[in-house]
UniProtKB/Swiss-Prot annotation:
Record family assignment: Belongs to the universal ribosomal protein uS8 family.
Primary localisation category: plastid
Lineage: Eukaryota, Discoba, Euglenozoa, Euglenida, Spirocuta
UniProt-recorded name of the protein: Small ribosomal subunit protein uS8c
Assembly and binders: Part of the 30S ribosomal subunit.
Domain of life: Eukaryota
Cell membrane in keyword set: no
NCBIfam families named in the record: PRK00136.1
């Protein structure tokens, strides 16, 4: 059985869905992906998400559950609220930062999502709580 990086998988699925202007995307249901979806919804990057009833039986007999993320677009040209998503810390190369060294993304328009001892949070919240952690990804 292979281990997959659920964060990279989630971000890649969102990125690919944005390229074809899909309204929704299914990602693997874990506590981590649900927390990331909550942050993206709260910050206005996605419209909503729901825990899907759909399950998938893989070839090795593992049942996977999914969450459905509804993507957000604006205007008649259907421009996405998400311009770019960049994964920073990877399983082979972890990246950590103190709250003092956190920089704003895209001039404050974007945000950094961190994994801290207090759970997942944005860079703004980490700075106000004076907590550093692992930089998961940038989004703007």
């Amino acid at each position: 059985m292979t281990n997959i990086d659920v964060i990279s998988d989630m971000l890649t699925r969102i990125r690919n869905s944005l390229l074809i202007k899909a309204r929704k995307v299914n990602v693997i249901n874990t506590k981590l992906t649900v927390n990331i979806a909550e942050i993206l919804k709260k910050e206005g990057f996605i419209d909503s998400f729901e825990l899907a009833d759909a399950t998938c039986l893989t070839e090795n007999g593992v049942i996977k559950k999914y969450i459905t993320i509804f993507l957000k677009y604006k205007g008649p040209k259907q421009v996405s609220y998400i311009t770019k998503i960049k994964r920073v810390s990877k399983p082979g190369l972890r990246t950590y930062s103190s709250y003092k060294r956190l920089q704003s993304v895209a001039g404050g328009v974007g945000l950094t999502v961190l994994s801290t001892s207090k759970g997942l949070m944005t860079d703004r919240l980490a700075r106000s709580n004076k907590i550093g952690g692992e930089i998961l990804f940038y989004i703007w």
